[in-house]
């Protein structure tokens, strides 16, 4: 048995790749998991619901305001110090064999708590441009796994420890009884911009089938009036839809792009330009450069522009699926390092 301490949360983009890694590790070897979650956030809720066998410890932390010298950061920094002390106490009690971190401010807290404990730390960065937490903890990491080759440019100081894997994906054996549709996603909380844009698109297009995860029951009911649209407030078994999708329309969160690339589904990306450190825009532009996507900026997003992008994307056709799930590669690398 190996004892794994893990953190990566605050958003689904950090959480789901981490769960993919942990679930794959548990298939390869017996594990006991200590999971650090952000109090009141998605990681606490999802992990307690889906993995009651994990020991969950919540930390009361929030991300820092930008710029970092923002006056409100004084109070947040005090919370960070308390969270580091709590995390260190829990780590000393749990005695992990390995620590797996996938970004978000809680990863920075746990990484700093563990830096002098002699336990191997493994990082995964989902975004093209590494976040503050990953850059803070990188110097203490045994290996840094990345979703994009270009991320190496931002981690040159630790280039010997960087390994390009892609973004870990949670897979399911479930199948959906649908074929030849466009998958529309707005992220784990939905997107009013995408929902309202697509409502106008649906008024104009009836010859294409859409499956739309809206993020809210209200929007799902509103969009279900269109006969060619299957709308859900939230899709649980996302991978079963990715497997059958012909194209996609979404924000540009790293885990969404990771799924898009893994399953070989070309996409129309509308990056949220308010994301921290312009992560979504950078992710979208890199996916476009690699030939996986067409980027439509928020200020240029009109129903007609989206229709034109859908047409180009569907003509492109599906791309070859990745041969191996990045979660499998990462699990193999971790076990190879600690055995």
UniProtKB/Swiss-Prot annotation:
UniProt topology in membrane: Peripheral membrane protein
GO-annotated biological processes: carbohydrate metabolic process; cell division; cell wall organization; lipid glycosylation; peptidoglycan biosynthetic process; regulation of cell shape
EC number: 2.4.1.227
Gene3D superfamilies: Glycogen Phosphorylase B
GO cellular component, one term: plasma membrane
Reactions performed catalytically: di-trans,octa-cis-undecaprenyl diphospho-N-acetyl-alpha-D-muramoyl-L-alanyl-D-glutamyl-meso-2,6-diaminopimeloyl-D-alanyl-D-alanine + UDP-N-acetyl-alpha-D-glucosamine = di-trans,octa-cis-undecaprenyl diphospho-[N-acetyl-alpha-D-glucosaminyl-(1->4)]-N-acetyl-alpha-D-muramoyl-L-alanyl-D-glutamyl-meso-2,6-diaminopimeloyl-D-alanyl-D-alanine + UDP + H(+)
Keywords linked to the UniProt accession: Cell cycle, Cell division, Cell inner membrane, Cell membrane, Cell shape, Cell wall biogenesis/degradation, Glycosyltransferase, Membrane, Peptidoglycan synthesis, Transferase
Listed pathway(s): Cell wall biogenesis; peptidoglycan biosynthesis
Pfam family, one: Glyco_tran_28_C
Localization annotation: Cell inner membrane
CDD domains referenced in this protein's UniProt entry, alphabetically: GT28_MurG (cd03785)
InterPro entries for this protein: GlcNAc_MurG, Glyco_trans_28_C, GlycoTrans_28_N
Domain of life: Bacteria
Record family assignment: Belongs to the glycosyltransferase 28 family. MurG subfamily.
Function comment: Cell wall formation. Catalyzes the transfer of a GlcNAc subunit on undecaprenyl-pyrophosphoryl-MurNAc-pentapeptide (lipid intermediate I) to form undecaprenyl-pyrophosphoryl-MurNAc-(pentapeptide)GlcNAc (lipid intermediate II).
The protein's name in its UniProt record: UDP-N-acetylglucosamine--N-acetylmuramyl-(pentapeptide) pyrophosphoryl-undecaprenol N-acetylglucosamine transferase
Organism: Thermotoga neapolitana (strain ATCC 49049 / DSM 4359 / NBRC 107923 / NS-E)
């Amino acid at each position: 048995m190996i004892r794994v301490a893990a953190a990566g949360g605050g958003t689904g983009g950090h959480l789901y790749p981490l769960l993919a890694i942990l679930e794959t590790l548990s298939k390869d070897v017996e594990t006991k998991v200590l999971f650090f979650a952000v109090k009141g956030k998605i990681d606490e809720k999802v992990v307690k619901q889906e993995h009651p066998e994990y020991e969950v410890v919540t930390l009361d932390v929030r991300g820092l305001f930008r710029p970092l010298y923002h006056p409100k950061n004084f109070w947040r920094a005090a919370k960070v110090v308390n969270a580091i002390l709590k995390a260190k106490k829990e780590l000393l009690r749990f005695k992990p064999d390995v620590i797996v971190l996938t970004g978000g401010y809680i990863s920075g807290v746990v990484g700093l708590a563990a830096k002098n404990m002699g336990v191997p730390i493994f990082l995964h960065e989902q975004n093209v441009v590494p976040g503050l937490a990953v850059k803070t903890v990188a110097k203490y990491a045994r290996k840094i796994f990345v979703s994009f080759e270009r991320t190496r440019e931002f981690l040159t100081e630790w280039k010997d420890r960087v390994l390009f894997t892609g973004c870990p994906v949670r897979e399911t054996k479930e199948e959906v009884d649908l074929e030849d549709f466009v998958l529309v996603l707005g992220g784990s909380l939905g997107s009013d911009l995408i929902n309202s844009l697509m409502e106008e698109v649906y008024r104009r297009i009836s010859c294409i089938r859409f499956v739309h995860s809206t993020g809210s029951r209200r929007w799902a009911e509103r969009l279900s009036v269109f006969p060619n649209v299957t709308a859900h407030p939230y899709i649980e078994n996302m991978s079963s839809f990715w497997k059958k999708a012909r194209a996609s329309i979404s924000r540009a969160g790293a885990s969404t792009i990771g799924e898009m690339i893994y399953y070989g589904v070309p996409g129309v990306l509308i990056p949220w330009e308010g994301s921290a450190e312009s992560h979504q825009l950078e992710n979208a532009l890199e996916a476009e450069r690699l030939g996986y996507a067409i980027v439509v900026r928020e200020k240029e997003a009109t129903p007609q522009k989206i229709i034109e992008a859908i047409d180009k994307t569907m003509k492109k056709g599906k791309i070859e699926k990745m041969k191996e799930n990045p979660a499998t590669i990462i699990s193999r690398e971790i076990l190879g390092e600690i055995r």
